[in-house]
Amino acid sequence: MRRPICGAIALLLSACTVSSAPPSVTLTVVVSPSASAIVAATPTPSPSPGATPRPDPPVAAADADALAVQMVSAERAVRDQSVTGADLAWFGHLQQLTYRRLAATPELRDTVLAEMPSDLKTAATANADATADLRATVVPGPDLPSAWRIVEPAPLEDLARYYREAEAEFGVPWSYLAAIHLVETRMGRIRGTSTAGAQGPMQFIPATWARYGDGDINSDRDSIRAAARYLRANGAPANMANALFRYNQSQRYVRAVTAYAEVMRADPDAYRGYYQWQVYYLTTRGDILLPVGYGR
C-alpha cells in the first residue's frame, strides 16, 4: 500500500525532511536526559488545599525506581473506571512518557520492568518494546513539521464504536484498527499530508484510497473502515502479520502495532490509556510536545 516508514508513522517520534516553521502555540521539551523526576504514586483526582500541584504536562522520572512507580501508577489509573476526565488524560499522558523515557534511556529498561507486578508485566513489556521499535525507525532532526496541524481527537466512545463496527463488517480485530490509528496519527490528532503523500487519520496514499476507501479520507470512521477493508484484502484476520506488513513495510512497524493491539485484546481498558497519548516529535533538542493548536 504504502510509503517508507519515515513518512508514515505520523511520526509520533521524529521527522524525515521537514522545514522549520514558527508554531502558533508554546512548545515544551518534555523528555530529555536532564529532566527532573516527578513521581505520581496514586491517582489523586482533587489535590487538597496547599498540596503541590502535579506538573502539566507530566514529567517522567529519570531514575529507574521512581520511573517504575510512575509506570505502575499510570497503568493502574488508566484501567480504573473511576478515573475519568482530566485525571484519566493526565495519567494516560504520564503512561506514554514513562515508555518514552525507557526508549530514550534503554539502560533503565531491565530494572524498571523487573519491578512491574505480575498482572502488568506483559503489557508493560509490550509497550516498552513497541515504543523502542518505533523510536528506532527515525532519526532526530533540528526542525519541526511545517505541514501539520494538531487537533482534538474524536471522542473516545465514538472511535471505539468505529473500530467495533469495522470489525463486525470486515472481521479485522478492533484492537488492531485502534493500534494502527494510534501509531499513524495518535488517533486522529495529526492532520496533514506525510512526506510520502499519505493522508487522513489512517494515512492512505490517494491511489490506495481510490481502491479501498469509501467516503472522506479525512473522516475517522471512513478511514477506519477503509483500513479494515485493506487489511482483510491482505490476509487479515488469519494472517495479521502479512496484512500489517502490506500496510507499512517495516517489521518494526508490524511488531509495534501488534504489541499495542494484543495489549488491548487482552485488556480492552488499555484503550483508555492509549487514547490519551499525545503528539511528540523527536528532535536534536529532545522530545517536543506538539499540543492541540499547533500549526494553526
What do the PLM-derived regions correspond to, one by one?
Residues 195-201:
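Extracytoplasmic ligand-binding site segments that recognize negatively charged/polar headgroups
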Residues 106-111, 171-179, 192, 236-247, ...:
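Surface-exposed patches in mature extracellular/periplasmic domains of secreted proteins
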Residues 169-173, 197, 290-291:
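Extracellular/periplasmic catalytic domains that process cell-envelope and extracellular macromolecules
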Residues 185:
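Conserved alpha-helical segments that form or flank metal/cofactor-binding pockets of metalloenzymes
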Residues 90, 94, 179-182, 226, ...:
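Amphipathic alpha-helical interaction segments
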Residues 150, 154-169, 175, 188, ...:
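Alpha-helical segment that forms one wall of the substrate-binding/catalytic cleft
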Residues 1-165, 251, 259-296:
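Cell-wall glycan-active module
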